[in-house]
Amino acid sequence: MTDAYSYHQRILDELARHGLKPRPSSSPQQLRDAVRDLYKYEIKRLRDAYLAGAFPKRDFAGQVIELRKRYPLLSIPTELWTR
């Protein structure tokens, strides 16, 4: 039998910001992995933009911080995602 997960509304809202709408059978770890993959994609794009000269080095750290703020789920343990 597959586990059914009941997510806190705050977690569902954050997942929706990233285009994710979990099913009851979607495990927190699967969802965290998907969010992490999105973050990794965006951080690589940011790095590539920096290397292409889109912005100066002094702005890179600030942009990384702003990107990280869009992914608060990565700092919340998955054990706290469900009721």
Question: How would you describe each model-predicted region?
Answer:
Residues 57-66:
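Short, charged, amphipathic alpha-helical segments
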Residues 25, 52-57:
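Charged, low-complexity interaction regions
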Residues 39-47, 67:
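Non-transmembrane amphipathic alpha-helical segments
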Residues 1-35, 78-83:
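Long, non-catalytic architectural segments outside compact domain cores
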Residues 69-81:
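Amphipathic alpha-helical coiled-coil segments
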